[in-house]
Amino acid sequence: MDLFNNLALGFATATSLENLFFCLIGVLLGTLIGVLPGIGATATIAMLLPITFQLEPVSSLIMLAGIYYGAQYGGSTTAILINMPGESSSAVTAIDGYQMARKGRAGAALAIAAIGSFFAGTVSTFLVAIFAPPLTQIALQFGAAEYFSLMVVGLVSSIALAHGSIVKALAMVALGLLLGLVGTDIYTGTPRFTLGIREYADGLNFVAVAVGVFGIAEILRNLENEKTRSVLMAKVSELMPSREDFKAMVGPVLRGTAIGSILGILPGGGAILAAFASYTVEKKVSKHPEEFGHGAVAGVAGPESANNAGAQTSFIPLLTLGIPANPVMALMIGAMIIQGIVPGPNVATEQPALFWGIIASMWIGNLMLVILNLPLIGLWVKLLTIPYYVLFPIIMAFCSIGVYSVNSNVYDLYAVAFFGLIGYALLKLRCEPAPLLLGFVLGPLLEENLRRAMILSRGDPMTFVQRPISAALLFLAALVLVVVFLPSVKKKREQVFVEED
């Protein structure tokens, strides 16, 4: 009964005119970002963080959430029409979606992707509503030692699921943790790593770091290597899939939804891995595996359902534990902190309208996407003709104005420029910046809970292994590190990310 009352509160919050407007803005902007290859939801949300400072907390988080799952929808459009995924999670969709388009079935492929995405998004949103409250109650029982261990698990999982070298991912997490130390020590009041600059006494501005590492770095990378884009079909027709298509997509959509719902919770690239896992499963269970790569319906329906389900369930650890499952969720935590909200299990009890409003808005956003996306395909295709050299200077100007408006601090602009160059250098060195951001976000929380646990135990480090939940979480973190270095697992992991590239 409580679930229905809470959902009623959520829908009452999400259906206000203001929140419906920002939900619509979010999903449309997300679709646009998904359609334009090279920008991405992470960079977009990072660049929009300054704007959220001026909005109501519920409205801003609803808009950012809409951008995230809207980008999953939009990414499939370019994957199918021009064989260039707008989002990395749509890379698998391009394999069979583009082949369907070449056979004159672009409309059916887009409709299959949209229907699968809507079903998966709807189901996974209800899973969030069902599982978030009990997990929140469990999290309320956690002490400092348990939170420290939980964050260690989150960081280790992000390393295991990061692209490329595990050693590089470890280095990125370490760098993020170090950046999180900049500022004033919360217990002694001693400045740390501020280089004598008073403006950094409160630490590095999260918005400046995120905009630099993700936004500016991505812009520099795309300007250096602009891809040629030629749309395959000027006119997309026959959007309604045939009866055979519907029969062929039922199983893949159900399996993809299940796979994505589970993998989306894991820290790291849950939606991306879910798409690849779904494609692998569909190929193995298919009676005609030879059709994959040549326009198989299951090759579009399964991965699209999986990546959208993964995008939705990644909100579970964010809303219940305050732990980001991916870089976008880390940015969402940043948006909550900007609004004065402490991420974690207390959000559900202290601000139920915010908690349930976000969940309800996800269902509304999915409905908006499936209604709006197919009629607007012509517009999205035309937007693909905008050159990067026109688009990106405008974006950079808005970023600079937005970052400065948060604190009116010119040093934040220096930080954006510096971290933009750092982020670009990391991309050139094939170091994924996502673990860095997770380390930067979790670093202060990790330190605070570590020191609090040590104070409560009077300096006894055994407190972390004497408390059952904390010990189990630390054992899990150690197990993940050991498993990921096993030769067979390491080889399979490298194979997945090579296929994605």
Stretches found by the model and what they are:
Residues 111-227, 338-492:
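Membrane-embedded alpha-helical modules
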Residues 41-50, 64, 79-99, 130, ...:
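Re-entrant/interfacial helical elements at transmembrane boundaries that shape
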Residues 33-42, 80-91, 123-127, 263-272, ...:
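Short helix-coil transition sites and intra-membrane helix breaks within transmembrane domains
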